[in-house]
């Protein structure tokens, strides 16, 4: 091989390696991404069963039911729509009815029940999208710290 051919082989190998690395990173990120939805968005969104998403909203008053063992069912609402959620595990201390929550999981087997494997309780409702805050205010729900609503 001449020097020119060696250089081309090294450059070609480097480009091939870089392309493979970029494709691998893109594939890994596409598998790890969980899009955020509120219940009202799910009626418009086409979420395939088994697709991991984050579901956020308020825990509907009177909806928390404790099942066998550590299984808990509750409903997440954004005042436009409500989604039933099942979670098996220990809930965060701040979890309660009327409080903000983000559940991560998936709809399994075409069921309308969201199966969560992670539940995060929001300690403060002051940081929420303005359209959600406006809907809550229109229904008479009072919010603290309204100067922080975006």
UniProtKB/Swiss-Prot annotation:
UniProt subcellular location: Cell inner membrane
Topology versus the membrane: Single-pass type II membrane protein
Keywords: Cell inner membrane, Cell membrane, Cytochrome c-type biogenesis, Heme, Iron, Membrane, Metal-binding, Signal-anchor, Transmembrane, Transmembrane helix
Stretches that traverse the bilayer: 8-28
Cellular component, GO annotation: plasma membrane
GO molecular function, one term: heme binding
Pfam families registered for this protein in UniProt: CcmE (PF03100)
Ranges in the topological domain labelled Periplasmic: 29-150
Listed GO biological process terms: cytochrome complex assembly
Highest taxon above the source species: Bacteria
Main location: membrane
Tagged with keyword Metal-binding: yes
Protein residues bound to heme: 123, 127
Role played: Heme chaperone required for the biogenesis of c-type cytochromes. Transiently binds heme delivered by CcmC and transfers the heme to apo-cytochromes in a process facilitated by CcmF and CcmH.
HAMAP family attached to this UniProt entry: CcmE
Family the UniProt entry places it in: Belongs to the CcmE/CycJ family.
Protein name: Cytochrome c-type biogenesis protein CcmE
Protein species of origin: Sinorhizobium medicae (strain WSM419) (Ensifer medicae)
Phylogenetic placement of the source organism: Bacteria, Pseudomonadati, Pseudomonadota, Alphaproteobacteria, Hyphomicrobiales
């Amino acid at each position: 091989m001449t020097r020119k051919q060696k250089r081309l082989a090294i450059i070609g190998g480097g480009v091939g390696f870089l392309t493979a690395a970029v494709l691998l990173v893109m594939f890994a990120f596409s598998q790890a991404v969980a899009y955020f939805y509120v219940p009202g968005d799910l009626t418009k969104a086409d979420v395939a069963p088994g697709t991991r998403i984050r579901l956020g909203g308020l825990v509907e008053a009177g909806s928390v039911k404790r099942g066998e063992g550590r299984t808990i069912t509750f409903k997440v609402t954004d005042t436009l729509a409500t989604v039933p959620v099942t979670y098996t595990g220990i809930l965060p201390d701040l979890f309660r009815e009327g409080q903000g929550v983000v559940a991560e999981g998936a709809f399994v087997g075409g069921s309308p029940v969201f199966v969560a494997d992670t539940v995060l309780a929001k300690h403060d409702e002051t940081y929420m999208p303005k359209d959600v805050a406006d809907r809550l205010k229109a229904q008479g729900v009072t919010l603290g710290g309204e100067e922080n609503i975006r």
